[in-house]
């Protein structure tokens, strides 16, 4: 249904219930520290580290959680995989007050993941799987216009990791 006619057709008041819909990169980050980044990893080498911390990252999680903590009504719109990482993202975002109704499970794409290698000074290097968000297209957004119509604004990032959207940018 066209959101421009939703109010007239349904008698609904199109009050903006969501302050911001966060779209795009939605990631599970695995923080590995300390890693001596100045030394090549090399084959067969064991690096002893602190316990690996698993958290969320990407613009959807980072900005979404920050906005929710500022008492904004926010929602996530992205693809996740059909895997355990998707469950972790959904739980973390839900626990932080981010609406996850529009986190879409992609049938073939994996949830985006990153190994974040951190040295003693805080410098970071990344090993990243873009995963399902790279499969987002203009249709992914157009098919959810009713959801976006409930929002005051949207924030999309990172375009370079979503190549199927680049051709649709002005």
What are the residue ranges of the model-derived segments?
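Glycine-rich phosphate/adenosyl-contacting loop at the front of the ribokinase-like
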Residues: 2-79, 84-98, 151
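Ribokinase/PfkB-type carbohydrate-kinase core domain
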Residues: 2-31, 91-105, 117-170
């Amino acid at each position: 249904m066209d959101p421009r006619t939703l109010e007239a057709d349904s008698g609904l008041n199109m009050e903006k219930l969501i302050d911001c819909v966060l779209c795009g990169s939605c990631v599970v980050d695995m923080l590995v520290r300390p890693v001596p980044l100045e030394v090549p990893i090399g084959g067969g080498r064991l690096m002893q580290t602190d316990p690996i911390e698993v958290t969320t990252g990407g613009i959807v999680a980072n900005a979404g959680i920050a906005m929710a903590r500022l008492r904004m009504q926010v929602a996530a719109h992205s693809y996740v995989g059909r895997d355990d990482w998707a469950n972790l993202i959904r739980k973390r975002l839900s626990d932080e007050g981010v609406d996850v109704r529009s986190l879409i499970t992609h049938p073939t794409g994996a949830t985006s993941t990153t190994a974040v290698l951190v040295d003693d000074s805080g410098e970071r290097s990344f090993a990243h799987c873009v995963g399902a968000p790279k499969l987002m297209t203009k249709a992914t957004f157009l098919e959810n216009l009713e959801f976006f119509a409930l929002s005051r604004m949207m924030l999309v990032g990172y375009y370079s990791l979503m190549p199927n959207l680049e051709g649709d940018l002005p």
